[in-house]
């Protein structure tokens, strides 16, 4: 394959085909007198065409007719506002209108139809959507749009409203959004709001919405095994805060609620000193029985096997798992800006917001729960710019200071709260320069250079050292390895790999450094090896199922993933995962895009399931 695009590569996937016209022909297209071809009837000429513009143009013209009130055959009276429309358009978009206008209902024969229980502004927006396929959902209209979309059975609008509300979730409003979702039967939003409430319960319990909960919803929350609390004391304190917000009306529910607090899991000191001494608890016989049950559980450990039940079961909150991001790279002959996210729990790749620039040979690392994309090549220029991604907002920002040198095929890693950029090339030469970024100062500063120039280098952090592994010195691939000691600002050589590798993948897994794939002097590689820092030795592991140069390697939820690359003939979107116990690789699905020379990064899954980005998405405010 040679070096990555942007560094002199001319490699392309071998999937092009040469096509030509069938039948007999002569040079210049002239006919041949006496040819036997005249004995056969010529094939009829055909040209098949499907217009991509036609649907949009047709809708635009229909909307113009509506705006001018031409050929309209129905008027919707909504809250005193008259909205002109065409029955066929409304029926095609809405099952509600289809049933109204094509059945035997009285409205099917009326030219003016009154619609009740829908906000007139929401109806106007929904009718506009039927004609334009465009809508803006925002905080000021979502609470009227969603009920209207539910009534009119506009599923697409229901979904986008729910997605908008998911993005708005925070500890102060998640209970209100949950109730709203429940009222309008939005099951997915209800599920997400429940998960958010459980995970953020320690903040939710401080909100006014929590204090206003009806007793049934309070019970639903505190009985969950997945409630995320440091101890059961927090659950008891939350219940008592809720009770004391309106003691006169709520004290009758104390026993009903307290039975879902896992009193046997409290410390003896808290159970006796706080729960047992509370006047409201002591004044209720059923509550006293619950306290006595908890005391017996704590005082009689030999009897605990006979006392097991919901109140003795420890809570097991669902921890946010890790997700893998694939960033930029080279695809279909050009650098790309696209970014996608892999969730191992669902085995699903989803597009997220793209970078502002196309980047191949980009260095990627995670620092302070933010994903950094460093340098690369945009298909025309070498870059020194940096972008930073926040998974909570699904947005990239470009306010990060640039590196002092342009760099593509650069290695990037985090050590001691600094972001390091190692080697690469600047379009003139292969680099041994190393610099590090301080996020507090938003500033890059140079550190000691490597002893060897390296592009396509892999970097890893283990035991307080930064390792630079393989790459190319601009002439040939390397198997040498050196490591940086930040305490002495010095690079020292360690044992070399068994194989020369440039554009390899590298990751730390179970206290080993794994190096996989890449390219040697002749071909793309599937081989893999790992480094033991205790013995300063490299040892081989089983080869991957595919040759992969320009591959990304990352550890996600305790598993090692190899992502994308180039196999010598085609760019890859396949993924494989390594099992150290069986020493085997297995295929694990595909990305949406083929990627060579993209970066990979691993982060905790965001607390809210934000919008996934797509080119045809609805317009969203501030997105």
Curated annotation (Swiss-Prot):
* All copies of domain BACK, residue ranges: 174-276
Which InterPro entries would you find in this protein's record? Answer: BACK, BTB-kelch_protein, BTB/POZ_dom, Gal_Oxase/kelch_b-propeller, Kelch-typ_b-propeller, Kelch_1, SKP1/BTB/POZ_sf
Q: Report which residue ranges the record marks as coiled coil.
A: none
Recorded GO cellular component terms are: Cul3-RING ubiquitin ligase complex
Superkingdom field: Eukaryota
Pathway-wise, it operates in: Protein modification; protein ubiquitination
**Biological process annotations from GO:** negative regulation of synaptic assembly at neuromuscular junction; proteasome-mediated ubiquitin-dependent protein catabolic process; protein ubiquitination
Q: Which GO terms describe its molecular function?
A: actin binding; ubiquitin-like ligase-substrate adaptor activity
Q: Where do the record's region annotations for Disordered lie?
A: 1-54
Q: Where are the Kelch repeats?
A: 323-369, 371-417, 418-464, 466-511, 513-558, 559-605
Which SMART domains does the entry mention? BACK, BTB, Kelch
Query: Which residues get modified to Phosphothreonine?
Result: 19
- Ranges for domain BTB come to 72-139
Instruction: Briefly state the protein's biological role.
Output: Probable substrate-specific adapter of an E3 ubiquitin-protein ligase complex which mediates the ubiquitination and subsequent proteasomal degradation of target proteins. May have a role in synapse differentiation and growth.
Q: What is this protein called?
A: Kelch-like protein diablo
């Amino acid at each position: 394959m040679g070096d990555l695009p942007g560094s002199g590569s001319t490699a392309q996937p071998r999937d092009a085909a040469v096509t030509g016209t069938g039948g007999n022909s002569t040079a210049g297209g002239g006919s041949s007198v006496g040819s036997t071809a005249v004995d056969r009837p010529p094939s009829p000429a055909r040209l098949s065409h499907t217009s991509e513009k036609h649907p949009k143009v047709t809708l635009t013209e229909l909307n113009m007719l509506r705006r001018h009130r031409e050929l309209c055959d129905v008027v919707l009276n909504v809250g005193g506002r008259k909205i002109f429309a065409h029955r066929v358009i409304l029926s095609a978009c809405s099952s509600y209108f289809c049933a109204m206008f094509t059945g035997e209902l009285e409205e099917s024969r009326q030219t003016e139809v009154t619609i009740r229980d829908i906000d007139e502004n929401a109806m106007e927006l929904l009718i506009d959507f039927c004609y334009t396929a465009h809508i803006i959902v925002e905080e000021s209209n979502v609470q009227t749009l969603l009920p209207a979309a539910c009534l009119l059975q506009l599923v697409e609008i229901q979904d986008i409203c729910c997605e908008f509300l998911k993005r708005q979730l925070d500890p102060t409003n998640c209970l209100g959004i949950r109730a709203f979702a429940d009222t309008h039967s939005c099951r997915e939003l209800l599920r997400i709001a429940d998960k958010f409430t459980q995970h953020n319960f320690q903040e939710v319990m401080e909100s006014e919405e929590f204090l206003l909960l009806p007793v049934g919803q309070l019970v639903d929350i505190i009985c969950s095994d997945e409630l995320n609390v440091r101890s059961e004391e927090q659950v008891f304190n939350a219940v008592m805060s809720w009770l004391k917000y309106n003691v006169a009306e709520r004290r009758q529910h104390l026993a009903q609620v307290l039975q879902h607090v896992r009193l046997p899991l409290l410390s003896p000191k808290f159970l006796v000193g706080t729960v047992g001494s509370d006047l409201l608890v002591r004044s209720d016989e059923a509550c006293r029985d619950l306290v006595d049950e908890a005391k017996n559980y704590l005082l009689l450990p030999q009897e605990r096997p006979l006392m097991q039940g919901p109140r003795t079961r420890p809570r097991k909150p669902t921890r946010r798992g890790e997700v893998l991001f694939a960033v930029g790279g080279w695809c279909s002959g050009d650098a790309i800006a696209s970014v996608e996210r892999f969730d191992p729990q669902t085995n699903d790749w989803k597009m997220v917001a793209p970078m502002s620039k196309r980047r191949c040979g980009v260095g990627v690392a995670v620092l302070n729960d933010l994903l950094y994309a460093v340098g690369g090549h945009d298909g025309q220029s070498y870059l020194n710019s940096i972008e930073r991604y926040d998974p909570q907002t699904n947005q990239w920002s470009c306010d990060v200071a640039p590196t002092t040198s342009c760099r593509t095929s650069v290695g990037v890693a985090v050590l001691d709260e600094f972001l390091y950029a190692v080697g690469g090339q600047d379009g003139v030469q292969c680099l041994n320069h190393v610099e590090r970024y301080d996020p507090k100062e938003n500033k890059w500063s140079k550190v000691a250079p490597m002893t060897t120039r390296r592009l396509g280098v892999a970097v890893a952090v283990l035991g307080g050292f930064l390792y630079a592994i393989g790459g190319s010195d601009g002439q040939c691939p390397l198997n040498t390895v050196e490591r940086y000691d930040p305490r002495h600002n010095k690079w020292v050589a360690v044992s070399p790999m068994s194989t020369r590798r440039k554009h390899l993948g590298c990751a730390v897994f179970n206290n080993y450094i794994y190096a996989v794939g890449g390219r040697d002097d002749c071909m793309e590689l599937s081989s893999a090896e790992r480094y033991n820092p205790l013995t300063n030795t490299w040892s081989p592991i089983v080869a991957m199922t595919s040759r992969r140069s320009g591959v990304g390697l990352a550890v996600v939820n305790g598993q090692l993933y190899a992502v994308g690359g180039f196999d010598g003939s085609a760019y890859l979107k396949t993924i494989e995962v390594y099992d150290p116990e069986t020493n085997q690789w297995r295929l694990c699905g595909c990305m949406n895009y083929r990627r060579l020379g993209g970066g990979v990064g691993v982060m905790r899954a965001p607390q809210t399931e934000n919008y996934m980005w797509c080119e045809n998405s609805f317009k969203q405010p501030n997105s």
